[in-house]
From Swiss-Prot:
It catalyses: adenosine(1518)/adenosine(1519) in 16S rRNA + 4 S-adenosyl-L-methionine = N(6)-dimethyladenosine(1518)/N(6)-dimethyladenosine(1519) in 16S rRNA + 4 S-adenosyl-L-homocysteine + 4 H(+). Keywords: Cytoplasm, Methyltransferase, RNA-binding, rRNA processing, S-adenosyl-L-methionine, Transferase. It is found in: Cytoplasm. This is Ribosomal RNA small subunit methyltransferase A. HAMAP family: 16SrRNA_methyltr_A. Belongs to the class I-like SAM-binding methyltransferase superfamily. rRNA adenine N(6)-methyltransferase family. RsmA subfamily. The lineage of its organism: Bacteria, Bacillati, Mycoplasmatota, Mycoplasmoidales, Metamycoplasmataceae. S-adenosyl-L-methionine binds at residues 13, 15, 39, 60, 84, 101. Specifically dimethylates two adjacent adenosines (A1518 and A1519) in the loop of a conserved hairpin near the 3'-end of 16S rRNA in the 30S particle. May play a critical role in biogenesis of 30S subunits. The gene is rsmA. The keyword Metal-binding does not apply. Its EC number is 2.1.1.182. Gene3D superfamilies: Ribosomal RNA adenine dimethylase-like, domain 2, Vaccinia Virus protein VP39.
Length: 259
């Protein structure tokens, strides 16, 4: 069988650690579930998913891996799609679970693609760089708290499950990775979510500035004063100091009273 060659331009680091694969699978209820795997690489984790899942759909952008995967998983309950996940369309009405081992450069884009289609999914298990995992689960008043933290925690209950060292991959990455779980919240509203993402993105446009100096780029002084008076904010408050509930209320106030 042809040996897979990792492509640096795609940020490929293939999982090779059986214990990590088993640990990932332990965190998912695979019984009678349809799974989407983003970037199955050599199919190492795919093997473990196929043992328990009803069906696995794998998106793999690297065309050189497709014949290897097709040969390895012949006659299995698996569909391999040679396509960029960012271009994917989802038709099934049954909610699926997503498993992904993502390179740093595309993590946010893929997450927001999933968020935009939230009604199609119920859970994500994501392997990312450890620093990205810290941003996803970050709390207010911490250095890693960001618009990614807010978006992730708005859409789901997020947990950092465990750290994965470089030795678990080929080739070895230079930094640790971590596995994060997203359990999607019930009763999400697409328009409210879109508004929340739009608003919080602008609040964090310049992270080192005060909230006021971020808002001034799309609001006038009178509008900002209306917000500050209603929420009784200190003039020098920064975006990182406000929690998720406050941002939800802020976005709601903006779209119902100012926009």
């Amino acid at each position: 069988m042809q040996k897979p060659v990792p492509k640096k331009r795609l940020g490929q680091n293939f999982l090779k650690d059986r214990k990590i694969a088993e640990k990932i699978v332990e965190n998912i209820d695979l019984k009678n579930k349809e799974i989407i795997e983003i970037g199955c690489g050599t199919g190492f984790l795919t093997n473990f998913l196929l043992e328990k899942a009803k069906f696995v759909t794998c998106y793999e952008i690297d065309k050189n891996l497709i014949p290897i995967l097709e040969k390895k998983f012949k006659n299995k309950n698996l569909r391999i799609i040679n396509e960029d996940f960012l271009l994917a369309e989802f038709e099934s009405k049954e909610k699926k679970t997503i498993i992904a081992n993502l390179p740093y450069y595309i993590t946010s884009k893929i997450l927001f693609k999933i968020f935009a289609n939230f009604e199609k999914f119920d859970k994500i298990i994501l392997m990312v760089q450890n620093e990205v995992a810290d941003r996803i689960v970050a709390k207010p008043k911490t250095p890693t708290y960001s618009k990614l933290s807010l978006a992730s925690q708005y859409i789901a209950k997020v947990r950092k499950l465990f750290v994965v060292g470089p030795d678990s991959f080929f080739p070895k990455p230079k930094v640790n990775s971590a596995v994060v779980s997203f359990d999607f919240r019930a009763n999400l509203d697409a328009k409210e979510m879109e508004n929340f993402f739009w608003f919080t993105k602008r609040c964090f446009q310049f992270k080192r500035k005060t909230l006021y100096n971020n808002l001034i780029f799309f609001l006038n002084k009178q509008q900002i004063e209306k917000i500050y008076n209603f929420f009784q904010f200190a003039q020098n408050i920064r975006p990182q100091q406000l929690d998720l509930v406050t941002y939800i209320r802020l976005a709601d106030f903006y779209f119902n009273n100012i926009f």
